[in-house]
Amino acid sequence: MTESVRLPAASLKPSTVALPGSKSISNRTLLLAALSDNVCEIHSLLKSDDTDRMLEALDKLGVQIEHLAEGRLKVHGTGGRFPNRSADLFLGNAGTAFRPLTAALAVLGGGYHLHGVPRMHERPIGDLVDALRIAGADVEYLGNEHYPPLHIGKRQDCGERVIPIKGNVSSQFLTALLMALPLTGQAFEIRMVGELISKPYIDITLKLMAQFGVQVANEGYRVFKIPADAHYHAPEHLHVEGDASGASYFLAAGLIAATPVRVTGIGANSIQGDVAFARELEKIGADVVWGENFVEVSRPKGRAVQAFDLDANHIPDAAMTLAIVALATRQTCTLRNIGSWRVKETDRIAAMANELRKLGAKVVEEAEAIHITPPETPTPDAVIDTYDDHRMAMCFSLISLLGVPVVINDPKCTHKTFPTYFEVFSSLTETAE
């Protein structure tokens, strides 16, 4: 029987939330530290299913990692060459582990088997594999063409130094290639073919690579130039920012409930694009205060939450939260340019449409957009399916702030990025029933 949690109709208390570490930064940092030529102590790393899969993989590849007090880790870099030249790596549904590891292992070469849960085998990886093959990699599909699982063999350097790659399905393909090619020691030019989505995630990658000693020239997000003789050298200590995508639920709660909520661990100078979510809330009625290590959202009681029609390409993960905020506007709202939702942990456009309809909303799906017309009052005690997608579970918790109880199936799917989410959320609320 499916486990579920019932959230009663609730009011929000003025609150401060210390965010867990960013998943995007955590897994990039682990891999870069493992490939460095020195030792790096990582602070505030996210503890979750996705980071566990990366840590397990690095262990199987022979990377020495010490677990210290207070969740700190000491990663002993391998100098850009994993000790174990063959391994069987199970990576769950962790795209932030699967894609970068695929590229790094393909560039280094060896005998590697990469696989995951069934959904991971439905998430495309062909654009990355095509680019890696141009760079001389030996990558074989073990199931359906263009999808995991994969076998990686020995790379043959064919001398090609200009690598085209598509970026319209997932920016993680470009991230993976950017992080892997410096391991060759050769100069490379990566050229985008067509549109590049989710550019802020590329900014995270480039800023982290720079912290690890590799400067990539970014020419208008069309051409990326990797210098010759590059190698990774880690900072002695690195602090992982709080998760800006995870912040979106609490910031949206502050807007919906017209109650101040502050999140700590991110701020005005965050390297994560999803901090822009707070700016989108500002446009539709929120008061936002920015600090160096916090963002605070509130709304005056007399000010309505305004409807929106938003191109959400710059905040694809946090934009899911806006689909719930739409119900507080009492008017039709639209999220556009969200085609990447289709190939995430689930088809998020279809899943969001299905579950919003259970609440009485009228929803129109398009290939890359969703139109949401809220009900007068959401249906009480709607049973929300979460599709093994952490963000579906966290988004729909906000329904309890709209005056009705809601039942969330499989709440433990939040373990992918935020294992304590429901405990934290409940601690911020008071039952209104």
Curated annotation (Swiss-Prot):
Keyword Endoplasmic reticulum recorded: no
Keywords, in A-Z order: Amino-acid biosynthesis, Aromatic amino acid biosynthesis, Cytoplasm, Transferase
Any GO MF annotation of the entry: 3-phosphoshikimate 1-carboxyvinyltransferase activity
UniProt catalytic activity: 3-phosphoshikimate + phosphoenolpyruvate = 5-O-(1-carboxyvinyl)-3-phosphoshikimate + phosphate
Binding site for phosphoenolpyruvate: 23, 95, 123, 172, 348, 391, 416
Pathway(s) of this molecule: Metabolic intermediate biosynthesis; chorismate biosynthesis; chorismate from D-erythrose 4-phosphate and phosphoenolpyruvate: step 6/7
GO biological-process terms attached to the record: amino acid biosynthetic process; aromatic amino acid family biosynthetic process; chorismate biosynthetic process
Function: Catalyzes the transfer of the enolpyruvyl moiety of phosphoenolpyruvate (PEP) to the 5-hydroxyl of shikimate-3-phosphate (S3P) to produce enolpyruvyl shikimate-3-phosphate and inorganic phosphate.
Name recorded for this polypeptide: 3-phosphoshikimate 1-carboxyvinyltransferase
Lineage of source species: Bacteria, Pseudomonadati, Pseudomonadota, Betaproteobacteria, Neisseriales
Gene that this polypeptide is encoded by: aroA
